[in-house]
UniProtKB/Swiss-Prot annotation:
Keywords: Apoptosis, Coiled coil, Golgi apparatus, Membrane, Phosphoprotein, Signal-anchor, Transmembrane, Transmembrane helix. Widely expressed. Expressed in ovary, testis, prostate, thymus, muscle and heart, but not in small intestine, colon, lymph nodes, or peripherical blood lymphocytes. The protein is not detected in any of the above organs. This is Receptor-binding cancer antigen expressed on SiSo cells. The keyword rRNA-binding does not apply. The modification Phosphoserine is found at S36. Residues 1-6 are extracellular. Induction: By estrogen. It is found in: Golgi apparatus membrane. The modification Phosphotyrosine is found at Y94. The modification Phosphothreonine is found at T41. GO terms for molecular function: peptidase activator activity involved in apoptotic process. May participate in suppression of cell proliferation and induces apoptotic cell death through activation of interleukin-1-beta converting enzyme (ICE)-like proteases. May serve as a prognostic marker for cancers such as adenocarcinomas of the lung and breast cancers. It is present and overexpressed in many patients suffering from breast carcinomas, its level of expression correlates with tumor grade, suggesting that it may be involved in cancer immune escape. According to PubMed:12672804, it is however not directly a tumor-associated antigen, but it rather modulates surface expression of tumor-associated O-linked glycan Tn when it is overexpressed, suggesting that it contributes indirectly to the antigenicity of tumor cells.
Amino acid sequence: MAITQFRLFKFCTCLATVFSFLKRLICRSGRGRKLSGDQITLPTTVDYSSVPKQTDVEEWTSWDEDAPTSVKIEGGNGNVATQQNSLEQLEPDYFKDMTPTIRKTQKIVIKKREPLNFGIPDGSTGFSSRLAATQDLPFIHQSSELGDLDTWQENTNAWEEEEDAAWQAEEVLRQQKLADREKRAAEQQRKKMEKEAQRLMKKEQNKIGVKLS
């Protein structure tokens, strides 16, 4: 039974190889036919009659042959010059306002000053009485509320007393702050000691409970 199955399998594989070979041959023959049918034959001859004719090219030396060789100006005898002068006169002068104006600077002469006489002027000197300096008179201000300025005496000890009072007040405040700080520190230390004592008591109680059990 096994031998017959092996022979049948071998026969099927042979048929499959034959069919695949035939299929490849058929595909190759079909491709060759398509390529042979798609080929395009190109013409080997060229028709020169269809090419457009080029225009005749002229040399650059012959371009100015037809140009005029002389120019005649009508209306001679200086008419052209007079027309140009009239046109120049009609044009406005744009730079007229830009011409600089030169002005002479004024000279200031300073005369040498003569020494002033601060004394009382008399007829011998040539100075005027309005230019002479007078001695300052003492100014005495009297008021009904403040009294005479000469009789007022400054109390120098008042400033020192105020400074002492301010310093004493600052010292009292500083001492009070220091006492409050020490009080808070003592309170915190007391609370810390109480917590430590409670913790030790709980620890002792736990030990006693363990021993009893």
